[in-house]
């Protein structure tokens, strides 16, 4: 089919899309309607943690579809319970609520923190509802999660905002402490700010934050929608800092490409009462069966060590490129990395990469002066080398 034969005009406009219709994908590769192949270093913004059409996920999806798709979240089902058990067994959390998107999980985290703050009032007897978040953070596109986000301009798009989200500066503990009041209930952050430009919170800052929140009896909430599920080389990114948060959210990678997210908390924080939280598809057995396959593959012997090795390899290759072209360096954790371009050519490089022939390359520029890399966690060093070679060609032409 030609592009003109696809009724794309029926889709609501939300962003500028190129005239490409993807029809197949396997591993690190996508194929479009013309048969052109693309090396994918975006993977749906870190969603496809095991690459496109992973065999284990396909098997889990097919097997579950033949047994049970949707009995209603008012009842238990087998994959729901199994995945909750896997997550609690391999984290510091005791309770799990499943949802469909990272924004929904983060919305749930905000509700849970506010519920806990009502039950645990301040010394002055006030309900605690404010959650300190951070400049340049990204927590979703619902009204509350947009208000929680520190993305420039989002405070006016759908004004008035949901109140209660003062903004601190990442890796500046004094900026957090200065915002604490009798109405503060918690602090919420991404261990690595993805949309903000792949900005990692330092281990020292995470430890300071945990100490500060404990001192003031506040909740520490980690948004691991992008950084979690093996992306940073550990199962969860908070584990890099040897701390234990009170609440964590997961999305993207937990489903490996299917709509699945999770809100996790400790027993002490689990405050919801009947009717406080729910959702038509939460804990859906079709999605949680795939989630079980994803987590089991991430926990397979040597897998996370391999992520660390390939992350170090990608880092070294990006640093070499940076030095060769006089760029501003690189940063990140594991296989969530950024190349600092030093000038606003990110969008130009993304477009040129996609249009390369005979094979295209999919990259992402969260900021005009940054390229972000989110390959499948099982990407090979050969595929990294191929990407670096293509990027080298682009930098020669556009750098």
UniProtKB/Swiss-Prot annotation:
Q: What else is known?
A: May also have succinyldiaminopimelate aminotransferase activity, thus carrying out the corresponding step in lysine biosynthesis.
Q: What is this protein called?
A: Acetylornithine aminotransferase
Which reaction equation describes what this protein catalyses? N(2)-acetyl-L-ornithine + 2-oxoglutarate = N-acetyl-L-glutamate 5-semialdehyde + L-glutamate
Report the sequence similarity comment from the record: Belongs to the class-III pyridoxal-phosphate-dependent aminotransferase family. ArgD subfamily.
Name its GO BP terms in alphabetical order. L-arginine biosynthetic process
Organism ancestry: Bacteria, Pseudomonadati, Pseudomonadota, Betaproteobacteria, Burkholderiales
What organism does the UniProt record list as the source?
Answer: Ralstonia nicotianae (strain ATCC BAA-1114 / GMI1000) (Ralstonia solanacearum)
Which InterPro entries does the entry mention?
Answer: AcOrn/SuccOrn_fam, Aminotrans_3, Aminotrans_3_PPA_site, Class-III_PLP-dep_AT, PyrdxlP-dep_Trfase, PyrdxlP-dep_Trfase_major, PyrdxlP-dep_Trfase_small
CDD domains attached to this UniProt entry: OAT_like
GO cellular component entries: cytoplasm
- SUBUNIT field: Homodimer.
| Pfam families registered for this protein in UniProt | Aminotran_3
Quick check: keyword Lipid metabolism in the entry?
A: no
Q: Which PROSITE patterns match?
A: AA_TRANSFER_CLASS_3
What subcellular locations does the record give? Answer: Cytoplasm
Which residues are N(2)-acetyl-L-ornithine-binding? 141
Record's keyword terms, sorted: Amino-acid biosynthesis, Aminotransferase, Arginine biosynthesis, Cytoplasm, Pyridoxal phosphate, Transferase
Annotated GO molecular function terms are: identical protein binding; N2-acetyl-L-ornithine:2-oxoglutarate 5-aminotransferase activity; pyridoxal phosphate binding
């Amino acid at each position: 089919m030609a592009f003109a034969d696809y009724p794309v005009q029926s889709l609501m406009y939300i962003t500028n899309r190129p005239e490409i219709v993807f029809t197949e994908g396997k591993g690190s590769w996508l194929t479009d309607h013309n048969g052109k192949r693309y090396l994918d270093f975006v993977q749906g913004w870190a969603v496809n943690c095991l690459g496109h059409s992973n065999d284990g996920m396909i098997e889990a999806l097919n097997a579950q579809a033949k047994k049970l798709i949707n009995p209603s979240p008012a009842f238990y089902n087998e994959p729901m319970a199994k995945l909750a058990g896997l997550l609690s067994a391999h984290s510091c959390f005791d309770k799990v609520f499943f949802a469909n998107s990272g924004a929904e999980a983060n919305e749930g985290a905000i509700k849970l923190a506010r519920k806990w703050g009502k039950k645990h009032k301040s010394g002055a007897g006030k309900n605690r509802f404010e959650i300190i978040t951070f400049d340049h953070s990204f927590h979703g596109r619902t009204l509350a999660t947009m208000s929680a986000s520190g993305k420039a301009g989002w405070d006016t798009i759908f004004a008035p905002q949901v109140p209660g989200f003062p903004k601190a500066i990442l890796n500046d503990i004094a900026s957090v402490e200065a915002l604490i009041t009798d109405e503060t209930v918690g602090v919420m952050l991404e261990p690595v700010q993805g949309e903000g430009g792949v900005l990692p919170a330092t281990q020292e800052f995470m430890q300071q934050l945990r100490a500060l929140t404990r001192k003031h009896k506040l909740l520490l909430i980690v948004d691991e929608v992008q950084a979690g599920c093996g992306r940073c080389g550990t199962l969860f990114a908070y584990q890099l800092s040897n701390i234990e948060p009170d609440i964590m959210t997961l999305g993207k990678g937990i489903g490996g490409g299917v709509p699945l997210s999770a809100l996790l908390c400790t027993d002490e924080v689990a405050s919801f009462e009947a009717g406080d939280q729910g959702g038509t598809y939460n804990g859906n057995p079709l999605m949680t069966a795939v989630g079980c396959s994803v987590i089991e593959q991430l926990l397979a012997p040597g897998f996370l060590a391999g992520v660390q090795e390939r992350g170090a390899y990608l880092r070294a290759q990006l640093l070499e490129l940076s030095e060769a072209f006089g760029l501003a360096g690189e940063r990140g954790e594991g296989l969530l990395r950024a190349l600092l371009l030093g000038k606003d050519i990110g969008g130009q490089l993304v477009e040129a990469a996609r249009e390369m022939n005979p094979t295209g390359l999919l990259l992402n520029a969260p900021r005009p002066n940054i390229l972000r890399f989110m390959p499948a966690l099982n990407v090979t060093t050969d595929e990294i080398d191929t990407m670096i070679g293509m990027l080298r060609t682009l930098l020669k032409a556009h750098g």
